[in-house]
Amino acid sequence: MKLRSIFRTIPILKRIYPSLFFKLSQLLNKNIFLSKFKGIYLNLDIRDPIDRSILLFDFYENKQIKYLSKIFKKNTINYFFDVGANSGIYSLVMSKQFPKTIILSFEPVKSTFKKLNKNLSLNPKLKNIKKYNYGLSNINSKLKMKALFKKNFI
C-alpha cells in the first residue's frame, strides 16, 4: 500500500497531512506539482480540491474509474465521450488502459481546457484523445460559459 493511501485511511493523518503540505507549499511559494496517478502524469494545483486529493492521497473517484475500466474490459468500446472533461483525468486514464478506444474530451471552460491541454502534453504517448473546447447540450445554440472562481480554482 502506498504511503499516500495510508494517509487517507488514518483519520488523524488525513487531517494533519494536507495542512502540513499546504503550509509547506506556501513557504516554498509553490502551488503546482507534477504527479503520477494511475499511470498518467498530471500537473496538479494544491489549491484545487480534486488535484489536492490526487496529490496528497493518490485518490480521485477510484471506484468509478475501476468500474468504468471493468465495463471497457468486458465490452468493445470504440468511442468514449468525456463530457465536462475538466483536467482530463478520465480521458487520460482510459486512454492509457485502452489505446484503441477513441476518446472525445469536451471541456467548455477555457482556463480548465488549458489545464487539460497541459496534462495531455505530459502524456505524449497517448494519441487517441481528441479534445474540444465546447460544452454539449441537446440544444444547438451558442452560450456564454460562466464559471465561479474561488481560491483560484473553478
Briefly describe each language-model feature range.
Residues 1-154:
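Phosphate/nucleotide-binding beta-alpha loop and adjacent structural elements of enzyme active sites
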